[in-house]
Amino acid sequence: MKWFKKLMKKYMIKLANHILDEDAKNIDRALQRKALESTVNFILNEKKLIKSRVFKNRFELLEYSISQITINGLIMEFGVYKGESINFIADLLPNRQIYGFDSFEGLPETWGYNFYKGTFKLDNLPKVRKNVVLVKGLFEDTLPKFVEKHRDTPVSFLHIDCDLYSSTKTVFNYLKNNIVAGTIIVFDEFFNYFGWEEGEFKAFYEFVEECEVDFEWLGFVINREQVALKITGIKGK
């Protein structure tokens, strides 16, 4: 039995050294550590965020955020992909119509350093619940007509899962008059990845500055990228 323990010890030491050697040259892990550090700094500086609710996964965050809806209005998701999250939302709100926007042609431009243009393209539309309406096309092509039709309807719940700064910017540009006090917004890629400061995060804070938006944090996922908040006031519209 002693020989087996010695053998296992040698094996574990060899394995640990191999992992350490691989990690020492792993650029992706190094970039993620930098992203985690900057994310933690942001959370520490945002005193109210650190005091908000913490969730184990994005579905817990989505469920809680939906429970905080207080106004009647549009339920919208931007970035549907295979429909996992929009179906989850639809199941929680079976009596509401959910609008899902996506080109289904993949990313319109490269995102970060490892998600190239066309990533997430689907050959067929995803299967969605009966209370889901899919709006196919680029946001800048589909939103003008949609907003014209719903110009007087507020957004009650907004799920931003479009990854890119440009796409998120387009959403806020077109929906800024529909976003009101009480609107709940959940971001799927807000922080905690390399380059997060130039993505959904940046587009949101530009909207906050442009429209003089006040908001409160609802919570975030402890080991992922998701964040939820509630608009409490808009002065600049």
Task: Give the label of every model feature segment.
Residues 1-50:
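Membrane-proximal basic amphipathic "stem/tether" segments
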